Amino acid sequence: MPASVNEVAQAVRRDWSPNRPVVVAGSTHEGEENLLLSAFQSLLNDFPDLLLVIAPRHPERFESVVKLVARQGFKASRRTMQSGALDPDVQIQIADTMGELPVLYAAADIAVVGGSLIPIRGIGGHNILEPCAVGVPVIFGRNMANFLEISDIALSAGAGFQVGDKADLIVQLKRLLNDAPLRGVVGEAGRKMVEQNTGATQTTCELILPLLTVR
């Protein structure tokens, strides 16, 4: 990861809190947030300080996701409203920013990539190379028709986990949240996979450079 990107990610993590476990769910679609929130509720029993960051795929859905989270009773915030350290009472942050997702992945402990968790017409997954390139373990669903080769390579490399339903998602999240060394091993496997298959420096720069001028 370029030094400048690493610095941005470190600053984001400091604002979230270095001590809280953080899961970033990126490129989510309608229906997936419900699944994620249900899984999150179950995880709070074992990880009461867990922070879930949800980055909807489409900006026009930011407001509806904020309302969905509020209806379910979670303490939430919008990333665009954050100034300085995040209130420790916030359980879920909505990443209502553009171009920032790779840095959010880099600041996370675990990444969940949307567009794959439930069947969605016309959608067959999203780019799992983003979290892999920054050394973060990735979880994705079975609906990866548009990224079959990449997902197969990632699974073979031990760079992530594929889940079939909410129960499976909870199991894999618990496994990773409970095991920091495992997160390191899986994240490093993803970084090496990107390096071996596409060239880490070029890929990481292509993924992240556009956001360096975007908060």
Predicted regions and their residues:
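Nucleotide-activated sugar donor-binding and catalytic core shared by glycosyltransferases
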Residues: M1-R215
